[in-house]
Amino acid sequence: MKERTVLPIAVVGLSLLWIGTLGLWALDAQQADPVAVDGSKAVSTEQIKWKLVTTWPKGLPGLGSAPENFARRVEEMSNGRLSIRVYGAGEVVPPFEVFDAVSQGVAEMGHGASYYWKGKIPSSVFYTAVPFGMTAQEMNGWLHYGGGLELWRELYAPFGVRPFAGGSTGVQMAGWFNRELKSAEDLKGLKMRIPGLAGEVFTASGGTSVRLAGGEIYTSMQTGVIDAVEWVGPYNDRTLGLMEVAEYYYYPGWHEPGAMLEFTVNQEAFDRLPADLQAIVEGAARATNQDMLDEFTARNNSSLTSLLDEYETKLRPLPDDVMDILHSNAVIALDKLKEDDPMAAKISASYEDFLDGVRTYHEISERAYLNARDRVLPPISFTDQ
């Protein structure tokens, strides 16, 4: 009888061992790859907190509100799994150190303008604005469907930074001046806050370019440190009170026809995110990019009316010879940049090729329509001019 019980006991023992092993495997699998009730892959509930530093004063409409809107979108879309705290210029790092802060991991994200890093990355100017270059609509087309974004990421990759388009103001104003410009001669000796490639162009045209952050502009104009300033357009310029420190407001924005801002993300921090949160960051950036252009398009109108009617700002077009000398020097500056920097030559080839193509189509679409509209609608005039 005892011999008959050996096999069943052995079988039971092996079965229990096998069941226990399967249970451990299942537990390990569940811990490594959670599964929802319906059998789909469960979403991690880990809460991640990021810092986002900016080059703008806290609460500045348009530029400053864009990163706040981005952070809100990310938190809502991720159901609170990714929370981003936004810091204004100087709260964590000075405005012109935002790129380095993201590169070094001091903050996971930044928001600013790429031409602020011109001293470190000369080719970065292409991703804010090129004088007499693309509009916001054209820039977005080049970035997202013309290869521009891929080149941008190649440019920032050595610094461990991943860029996204972060909003556009549309065509800007040429700037505020404390004296009237009647000809190109009036540029001589003029000190102007104007960054990027346009700063080089302005200096070559007889003026002196000065690099200032947004929070320093008003006082610098008020105290005579500078004679002129370009910032954005009526919406933001009115907020900064620039109509109080300068009499003349010039157009068009030859230097920033479609100023593009940027979100920068520390690449290692981005790589650590689950795939769905990566997609949320990218999607929120894309939405914020378009939203800023919408906001400036809507708000500039009433702000310009206020500047003209309430503050009696003197609105002026730049004289033709001023535009001519600025364009001539812009060509020279761009050619020199391409000669000195192989990456600039590579990016410029893509940029110029896209611009040539889009200009051809816009000649019979955008421009043709605007001409047709002007022909049938009442003319627009400014009483001050």
Please place each PLM-identified region on the residue numbering:
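N-terminal secretory/targeting leader peptides
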Residues: 2-134, 138, 157, 163-385
